[in-house]
């Protein structure tokens, strides 16, 4: 049987410094918090003063967030300072392949999550963290495993970059044909969204009748509006659920638009007749607009429209606000030309996405094989 070692016997884990809000300024070294690692921060603070040398991080340092959001990262953004709730890993106890260690910890994040404590700020206590065990083969085997997994990760990243290039290509084509819609650089006629089709919002069937959620009709939440075409919802409902609630059946080819909080102006086009909850608005377009063109028109104007949201804690839109939004309208034949271009690009994207999904399955299988 493969030898196992405790994380606490492999390395020393140095917690970051508890910087105070008043320590954060605009000059000096960046203060790295958990949200700066996860990509959810748009507000990097800086510290220009003396600090414990142990909380300094540099390229190549391995970091582990252990509170609120668990994760393992290899730092690559230059000299910085580590905030509390993140460990810097010092490999000072035994010889270990650092990349192998990162993959092993990544695999064990779910086990760590199960050991988290706390009502508000969930965290894993140091004792539980130290006691987590990982397989510990020879140095040669560690390197072999790390190299194999890195190759698969690189393929995954390359596939993701391919998908991003397709998105960039579509946006470039849009601007080439229609200009910048926020500034209406092509001087197109302006129309309100209310004039471009029939509008409605969704609803939620009663949860006290579980049978309502045992049907085969897609019922979307705003959080599921992540792709151009919607392929299927997490929850399904029955025809009776639609008849006895505020939800409605929207036609295939309609566009769902999220209205609330972080899902505001997330969008997706229905491939099948479907329903949604009350957090979604829906437009069934008239003959003046091609729905694929409208999707991209709204994507291009998304940030402009989001700036008009209401609410202090939750920045929300509502159906009336969305219907009142005004957009430049291109000629229908140009819309159709753009839509045909998108469909061709989408065929290529589907192939790359399939390859990405298969590579991700391979990675997950290898992780299970090596660390499960």
Segments (PLM) and residue ranges:
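Sequence-specific dsDNA recognition surfaces
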Residues: 5-20, 30-59, 191-209, 223-252, ...
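Non-catalytic DNA-recognition/assembly elements of restriction-modification systems
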Residues: 1-17, 131-147, 158-203, 324, ...
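A short beta-sheet element
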Residues: 33, 52-106, 221, 238-299, ...
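A short glycine-rich beta-alpha junction/loop motif
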Residues: 66, 80-87, 118-140, 259-260, ...
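Short coil/turn segments at secondary-structure boundaries
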Residues: 20-27, 118, 186-189, 206-214
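Active-site/binding-pocket entry motifs
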Residues: 37-40, 69, 88, 111, ...
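Short, solvent-exposed loop/turn positions at domain surfaces
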Residues: 50-51, 157, 244, 311, ...
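Short amphipathic alpha-helical signal-transduction/dimerization elements
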Residues: 105-109, 113, 153, 299-302, ...
């Amino acid at each position: 049987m493969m030898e196992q070692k405790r994380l606490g016997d492999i390395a020393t884990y140095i917690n970051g410094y508890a910087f105070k809000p008043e320590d954060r300024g605009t000059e000096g070294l960046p203060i790295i918090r958990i949200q700066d690692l996860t990509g959810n921060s748009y507000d990097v603070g800086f510290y220009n003063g003396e600090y414990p040398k142990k909380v300094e991080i540099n390229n190549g340092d391995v970091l582990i967030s252990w509170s609120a959001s668990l994760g393992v990262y290899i730092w690559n953004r230059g000299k910085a300072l580590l905030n509390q709730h993140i460990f810097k890993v010092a490999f000072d106890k035994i010889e270990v392949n650092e990349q192998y260690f990162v993959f092993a910890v990544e695999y064990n994040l779910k086990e760590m999550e199960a050991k988290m404590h706390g009502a508000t700020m969930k965290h894993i206590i140091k004792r539980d963290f130290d006691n987590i065990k990982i397989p510990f083969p020879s140095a040669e085997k560690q390197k072999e495993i790390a190299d194999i997994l890195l190759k698969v990760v690189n393929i995954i990243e390359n596939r993701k970059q391919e998908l991003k290039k397709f998105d960039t290509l579509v946006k470039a084509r849009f601007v080439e044909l229609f200009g910048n819609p926020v500034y209406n650089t092509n001087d197109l006629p302006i129309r309100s969204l209310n004039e471009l089709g029939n509008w409605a919002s969704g609803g939620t069937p009663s949860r006290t009748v579980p049978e309502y959620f045992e049907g085969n009709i897609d019922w979307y939440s705003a959080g599921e509006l992540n792709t151009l075409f919607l392929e299927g919802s997490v929850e399904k409902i029955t025809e009776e659920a639609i008849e006895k609630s505020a939800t409605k059946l929207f036609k295939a080819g309609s566009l769902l638009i999220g209205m609330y909080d972080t899902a505001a102006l997330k969008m997706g086009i229905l491939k099948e007749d479907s329903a949604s909850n009350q957090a979604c608005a829906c437009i069934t377009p008239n003959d003046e607009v091609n729905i694929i063109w409208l999707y991209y028109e709204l994507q291009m104007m998304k940030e402009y429209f989001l700036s008009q949201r209401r609410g202090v804690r939750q920045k929300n839109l509502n159906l009336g606000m969305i219907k009142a939004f005004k957009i430049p309208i291109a000629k229908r034949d140009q819309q159709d030309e753009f839509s045909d271009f998108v469909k061709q690009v989408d065929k290529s994207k589907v192939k790359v996405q399939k390859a990405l999904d298969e590579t991700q399955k391979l990675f997950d299988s290898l992780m299970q094989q090596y660390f499960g």
